[in-house]
Amino acid sequence: MKVLIVESEFLHQDTWVGNAVERLADALSQQNVTVIKSTSFDDGFAILSSNEAIDCLMFSYQMEHPDEHQNVRQLIGKLHERQQNVPVFLLGDREKALAAMDRDLLELVDEFAWILEDTADFIAGRAVAAMTRYRQQLLPPLFSALMKYSDIHEYSWAAPGHQGGVGFTKTPAGRFYHDYYGENLFRTDMGIERTSLGSLLDHTGAFGESEKYAARVFGADRSWSVVVGTSGSNRTIMQACMTDNDVVVVDRNCHKSIEQGLMLTGAKPVYMVPSRNRYGIIGPIYPQEMQPETLQKKISESPLTKDKAGQKPSYCVVTNCTYDGVCYNAKEAQDLLEKTSDRLHFDEAWYGYARFNPIYADHYAMRGEPGDHNGPTVFATHSTHKLLNALSQASYIHVREGRGAINFSRFNQAYMMHATTSPLYAICASNDVAVSMMDGNSGLSLTQEVIDEAVDFRQAMARLYKEFTADGSWFFKPWNKEVVTDPQTGKTYDFADAPTKLLTTVQDCWVMHPGESWHGFKDIPDNWSMLDPIKVSILAPGMGEDGELEETGVPAALVTAWLGRHGIVPTRTTDFQIMFLFSMGVTRGKWGTLVNTLCSFKRHYDANTPLAQVMPELVEQYPDTYANMGIHDLGDTMFAWLKENNPGARLNEAYSGLPVAEVTPREAYNAIVDNNVELVSIENLPGRIAANSVIPYPPGIPMLLSGENFGDKNSPQVSYLRSLQSWDHHFPGFEHETEGTEIIDGIYHVMCVKA
């Protein structure tokens, strides 16, 4: 246990009260309580701001000075941002303290200890009792139960075979593995025979209580804890919602797990096509694509569904937000899509934090309270491990029940099909803890901190861009509004100079309005989408607002390679866009290093520093290509290639339309199982049917889905693969990753259904 004692700067240490505080600190130490002492408000505030976990906050204040009242309020406020139920003690003279405090302040203090009347041992005992009660309610249901069960130190005769880690200690490699991860991981790795903990698959005991807790915090009627990632969550929902007789509506900007769900179920898809801007940034599906008339027309015209014209789709899925951080007004989208289907699925794998900050109001699935829901059944899937705080593979399915609801027993059959009978309890517990971290005040505090850091970074980049361009030079600029308006005053500001509080709390600063050039989404409806502040893209120079390449530019691939050499890994790179995810683990020092590294790139780029000095590994590996080049020379060569070939335009064309679907994804997959497939080189792809999806990274979205036809030799799909092949040949070391292709002797091949 740990106590923070904050003493007033107005209290002299050598007074009788000061000596009494010293005796209390000694008494606490004798009860194995760690005592941290602070002798000023600033020091105490700094300790709490550093996320120091404490079990009790004590003030040695007489409350006679006006500043003491304000200090106490601020310190308790800071404490409660992340540690809401920590007991607060006021140590003081009874008559003076009570007489000086108002009602609001009295309500913030849990206990008053009269330091001159009660003994130090008595006050210490009261504090230990309060801290014990606090700790008993601190941990969420499953994690608490696991810790208690681990303390039993049982002799187990069941799986897993390592028996609490003992098995690993019997060889040197196993011992090293055991010591590296620590004993608690292995002690809590238990089989499903521990009935006192309940069951993940039956949702009983501590597992069931954990899911009820998650449902309350995330605003669902029911939540399902998943340990096979959101890929498993998505497949589970699809397996529960559809069969091979169903028509379903799918966002073309979908994760590959959605296609896998189509393979498993055999359902017949029609697709909603999202928008893209000049940079290849993924925008929203426009409302006209979601209109019931539009979707029924697609059903009647698609080769896969035309025999089911007029049939009501059993399911509809939308990716929210897009990978680039474009968030739908989910309320508006739901109002449209519920006219088509009674089951809506928002794949919010990268967006599980939205409920906890008002800046995202109306732009996520689990809006408001479950009891107020009246409409279709709504699913949301969250990767708690992505931008919350959980171990990899941790995920949640959240459900608001309405029309088309699937009862527990039926849904659980699909859940068990995709779960495991041997879950790693550490993943389950991390899901539980991720929920508890978002409960109460801490959810707002944690999300606000991330938004604050992201906005600070954006403004720092905007100021540098402004300064460099004023000097006739170049720099990277953040992809966001260049001018914002305070809706209360009507005053406008350059983004770089806008009040931070305006940018971090007012949603309109991030809403995409029609006619704004910065976002580049033509004809976007008002109040349809907003940019997520924490998904930060920076733009390298080289592309004009009309989408045409300028005379000179800096290819983003070269910048990303520079960053990688300095230990910085962006989440996504296109021709002129580099994207960074701000999360709860990002610090000011981390993004400060990023800014410095970008400035370093500019300095060396402008100086045309030889590649042998700044990227020696590249020169060593490919001396024939790069030996005599400077970094600016390479950038110019890359830019000239981009200007001539413009692969981004080919990719935008590929994503703006739909290839002909010859067979369903399931039928294409069956061809793989039957070995009725062959690898086909790029020049022979025209007219062939893809057996697997082709997914360029970035953006990680299917350009072609299983069962679709490549089209003729000039189709955007074939043209784009041809341009990638050319890029890889010209710039070894900068190859693109394209899932679903195989490169043989420098030639792209794709697995196709045999003709």
UniProtKB/Swiss-Prot annotation:
Positions of modified residues (N6-(pyridoxal phosphate)lysine): 386
Stored Pfam families: OKR_DC_1 (PF01276), OKR_DC_1_C (PF03711), OKR_DC_1_N (PF03709)
Entry GO MF terms: arginine decarboxylase activity; pyridoxal phosphate binding
Reactions the enzyme catalyzes: L-arginine + H(+) = agmatine + CO2
Co-factor remark: Binds one cofactor per subunit.
Keywords of the record: Cytoplasm, Decarboxylase, Lyase, Pyridoxal phosphate
Any one biological process term the GO annotation gives: intracellular pH elevation
Induction: Under conditions of acidic pH, anaerobiosis and rich medium. Forms an operon with downstream adiY but not (further) downstream adiC.
Superkingdom per UniProt: Bacteria
Enzyme class: lyase
UniProt cofactor(s): pyridoxal 5'-phosphate
Location within or outside the cell: Cytoplasm
EC assignment: 4.1.1.19
Disruption outcome: Loss of formation of agmatine, loss of arginine-dependent acid resistance.
Activity modulation: Homodimers are probably inactive, their assembly into a homodecamer at low pH requires neutralization of negatively charged residues. This uses cytoplasmic protons, contributing pH regulation and stabilizes the homodecamer.
Any one annotated GO CC term: cytosol
Summary of the function given for this chain in its UniProt record: Component of the acid-resistance (AR) system allowing enteric pathogens to survive the acidic environment in the stomach. ADC can be found in two forms: biodegradative (this enzyme) and biosynthetic (speA). The biodegradative form plays a role in regulating pH by consuming proteins. Converts arginine imported by AdiC to agmatine which is then exported by AdiC.
Similarity field: Belongs to the Orn/Lys/Arg decarboxylase class-I family.
Quaternary state and interactors: Homodecamer. The basic unit is a homodimer, organized into a ring of giving a pentamer of five homodimers.
The name this protein goes by in its record: Biodegradative arginine decarboxylase
UniProt gene name: adiA
